[in-house]
Amino acid sequence: MLQPARQKFRKMQKGRNKGIATTGNKVSFGEFGLKAIGRGRLTARQIEAARRVMTRHIKRGGRVWIRVFPDQPISKKPAEVRMGNGKGSTEYYIAQIQPGKMLYEMDGVSEELAREAFRLAAAKLPIETTFITRHIGS
């Protein structure tokens, strides 16, 4: 699963996920893309589950790029522990997703195969997504 190799700080504040994606919102590497139109958080497990179902569906054909990286640690206290006594330990990592963010890209396959692979991947994700095609010449 994806997680940072090292970080400056071990724990992070929750923060807010506002606005729309200004970077990473175009098809840059492949021919087809899966773009977020909803807002939310993707865990490393969800990103990996979607990647697996896509690569299995395209069967050694084509190439898949993951355009998001889970770099925000989420801490959690153990069960039945009283409040206080500091912040819990890091449980997993998430990627904050804003509308317009490109999640995955694919190349080397037909449009029908890519569309079906992205449909299967979107079922594994908790946010609303759409299929995008790169426009030649733009």
Swiss-Prot record:
One of its GO terms (cellular component) is cytosolic large ribosomal subunit. One of its GO terms (biological process) is translation. One of its GO terms (molecular function) is tRNA binding. Residues 7-17 have a biased composition (Basic residues). InterPro entries: Ribosomal_uL16, Ribosomal_uL16_bact-type, Ribosomal_uL16_CS, Ribosomal_uL16_dom, Ribosomal_uL16_sf. Residues 1-22 are annotated as: Disordered. Keywords: Ribonucleoprotein, Ribosomal protein, RNA-binding, rRNA-binding, tRNA-binding. Belongs to the universal ribosomal protein uL16 family. Binds 23S rRNA and is also seen to make contacts with the A and possibly P site tRNAs. NCBIfam families: rplP_bact. Part of the 50S ribosomal subunit. This is Large ribosomal subunit protein uL16.
